[in-house]
């Protein structure tokens, strides 16, 4: 039987016609470029010595090397200095075409697609309870089919209309993942507890939605709580930039109780109404374009990727380019584990067969030509390698300049999205003396490759829901490679903060803690002069530092050797008491000398 002809509109022609390659060159006195470059590369293009440029920066007090990456402003300054004009041209290539190419569809080919909803809110405001109530199932359960759900992507039907929900993690540690969620989202449901009001994560969710220009529906949860304060809540929402319909704005507000199932239908009604206003369309007659929601390596099926098609139709057997690689879709399942032959826009599905785990938030494109899919993915891989090389080169240059201590980390997690979120979180843990470098991050169990990389890069391995087997653990111990596994993200943060603090050279400052006056000097042949003193202010300890002043002039800066009260050695003397004091290696004390008592404090 002849293979059925694929009548879907190909994406290839629009990609080929809109790709713009910019040649970096000096042409007719104008330096044309599209992206940052190193001093060495710039010097080569304008035919001068790179060392000359390095010297120019040195005279300005900047210690650059030939591998320093020049910013657009620095390139412009160098062009003017050497007598050239410049022009920055936007390049559309394999690495960025999905963000820049426009795919045009005929109006008569368009159909309505389901709205994609992201539920956001502060921790403990009832977001998970609302999700559970909407799904009418326990979100944390693991299905028995061999495919475990980690996506929080699901679809319901209300009033004969499909609604797709994305659940983004509720902790601010996952800001990056939540921001990605906003990019594929049509409507945000903002869950706010009636008895707690607007909190930091509420404001963060509002900021993400507004930055992505996504409309918001507010769901006021826990209306059954007697301590609710709706006036304060609405005022706080207004201050945070939410213009409620009740106050003449355009943001709907729904009141309810997720626990009791109250307000859910009203919420669905508002979603469908908002979706009608948005007039969400897609062309089912073209090859797919969409976004990766999550990906992981599943023991039973290999690579398991959750995607949402944003335009076109995804078919079993399609070639997808996502990130620097491509793969063929061997199977498609909906979120109820039902196998599908194809899926349109707005419906979350599991895809099997990509043989790799693309990053969460990565855009994908369906290509009906394997050779071209391979070409695109290879070009993207080459571009990413070049970008990574430039970043590493710049990092090495910065390290030389700032002379910081380096703490290298390798991250292994159960999902790609979580690994990236942890990476972003870890990179925020730094100070003036320690630079944290994430050498590598990925998914799966901790293995031999991780040990090899850790050994060559002097890295520590951090696992999240990822542990080494006993053999790998023993090898790590033999190689003196540290592995720490966690199941709570913020335990990683606490651990790393503690470790970094131990790496920092402690800093101290001296503070005055007391003042005393020498009343009389006693001489003992075995020890030398002992000062008989009165503690006038504060206190003195047996290990305190002491400054000796005579007629307001500092004559000695030393340390207490012995501290006595009567015949007994003591550790501390308080204000108002007389005491005996021996200053280490100093005998030139006299009556009426003033003592300033100093203590070192760690800062």
Swiss-Prot record:
PROSITE patterns tied to this protein: G_TR_2
InterPro entries with a match to the protein in the record: EF-G-like_DII (IPR053905), IF2_II (IPR044145), IF2_N (IPR006847), P-loop_NTPase (IPR027417), Small_GTP-bd (IPR005225), T_Tr_GTP-bd_dom (IPR000795), TF_IF2_bacterial-like (IPR000178), TIF_IF2 (IPR015760)
Region (G4): 221-224
Annotated spans, G1: 121-128
Annotated region described as G3, given as residue ranges: 167-170
UniProt region (G5), positions on chain: 257-259
Record-listed GTP binding positions: 121-128, 167-171, 221-224
Region of interest called G2, as start-end residue ranges on this chain: 146-150
Domain of life according to the entry: Bacteria
SUPFAM superfamilies assigned: Initiation factor IF2/eIF5b, domain 3, P-loop containing nucleoside triphosphate hydrolases, Translation proteins
Key words of the record: Cytoplasm, GTP-binding, Initiation factor, Nucleotide-binding, Protein biosynthesis
Pfam families: EF-G_D2, GTP_EFTU, IF-2, IF2_N
Major location (coarse): cytoplasm
UniProt KW GTP-binding keyword: yes
Domain tr-type G: 112-279
Cell location: Cytoplasm
GO MF term list: GTP binding; GTPase activity; translation initiation factor activity
One GO cellular component term noted in the UniProt record for this chain: cytosol
Function (record text): One of the essential components for the initiation of protein synthesis. Protects formylmethionyl-tRNA from spontaneous hydrolysis and promotes its binding to the 30S ribosomal subunits. Also involved in the hydrolysis of GTP during the formation of the 70S ribosomal complex.
PANTHER family xref list: TR-TYPE G DOMAIN-CONTAINING PROTEIN (PTHR43381:SF5), TRANSLATION INITIATION FACTOR IF-2-RELATED (PTHR43381)
Homology family: Belongs to the TRAFAC class translation factor GTPase superfamily. Classic translation factor GTPase family. IF-2 subfamily.
The name this protein goes by in its record: Translation initiation factor IF-2
Native source organism of the sequence: Mycoplasmopsis pulmonis (strain UAB CTIP)
Gene name tied to this protein: infB
